[in-house]
Amino acid sequence: MTNIRKTHPLMKIINNSFIDLPTPSNISAWWNFGSLLGICLILQILTGLFLAMHYTSDTTTAFSSVTHICRDVNYGWIIRYLHANGASMFFICLYMHVGRGLYYGSYTFTETWNIGIILLFTIMATAFMGYVLPWGQMSFWGATVITNLLSAIPYIGTDLVQWIWGGFSVDKATLTGFFAFHFILPFVVLALAAVHLLFLHETGSNNPSGIMPDSDKIPFHPYYTIKDILGALLLILVLTLLVLFSPDLLGDPDNYIPANPLSTPPHIKPEWYFLFAYAILRSIPNKLGGVLALVLSILILAIVPLLHTSKQRGMMFRPISQCLFWLLVADLLTLTWIGGQPVEHPYITIGQLASILYFMILLVLMPIASIIENNILKW
């Protein structure tokens, strides 16, 4: 009798993607983040669904509906904090996943990489809109500041901003629209993730050595399913500790003040996972220039495959590139710190230097380092 797992049209797809998938035998824990991102996405969709059952997207009741969820709904507080901190875990996994791709040269799978960039933009848009929904001070002013950036677009900017606002300021129409998009986009992300996997399985996974290991592959199950379960348990452990012991650690206290259009908070800043991009935005005095730098800080990933000058794929055997990579990581951490600081003397200069260094490493230093490494090896 033939195995249903290998013959049934639906089971066959699952089997070829998660069970009998030939996988390199040497992939490290850095390859765990794909499955962790899947878990985060499912968790966010489920907790979000239960929150949406009690949330009202109206400016007069949005803030109190979130309070109602935390106080009156059975286990509403844990659902709310799982959703809020789940977003933080999502972005930690995302940045690790992208960092892994940069380090090991996974960007040479251009289709997979480009879908990944689209996914990153979509998730960032979803998270931004989700932050607006509790309708606290930082929600309102964050929405005002970020949507207002579109007014820097020549000719159509002002009309575009008013179209997104649904009026002449951030108000009821904006909140309702953001809720609608925040609800639908995770399902778009789910579909894009399936396409991301589809393209990945066309080529097979990369591995730390960067060499195509067709002669040495093992089935995904049980070897990597058990490894992914360990990663998932660690993720759940960290998330649980965060939710149960310090749920507001990564949030902003200002968001516990209901939105007031007449009172601006002293420091308007986004959630921690956007601070690096926010620092790049603020480091350019010109509005349009800042917006372009903000978009390019992520879009620059799309040209990384074109700037790959090394004869080797990953950085495993390239010490100069490794140093530059970790300098880039340190630079991004510096930008994250700067993004959360007020616009004052030392911070402005540090932010500008860190922004220049960010683009310099990716556009100039890494390609040059690769050429130097090729010459050292006489390739």
UniProtKB/Swiss-Prot annotation:
Q: What does this protein do?
A: Component of the ubiquinol-cytochrome c reductase complex (complex III or cytochrome b-c1 complex) that is part of the mitochondrial respiratory chain. The b-c1 complex mediates electron transfer from ubiquinol to cytochrome c. Contributes to the generation of a proton gradient across the mitochondrial membrane that is then used for ATP synthesis.
A Pfam family (short name) is Cytochrome_B
Q: Which cofactor does it need?
A: heme b
What subcellular locations does the record give? Mitochondrion inner membrane
From what organism does this protein derive? Halichoerus grypus (Gray seal)
Source domain of life is: Eukaryota
Q: Does the keyword Cytoplasm apply?
A: no
Q: What else is known?
A: Heme 1 (or BL or b562) is low-potential and absorbs at about 562 nm, and heme 2 (or BH or b566) is high-potential and absorbs at about 566 nm.
State the protein's name: Cytochrome b
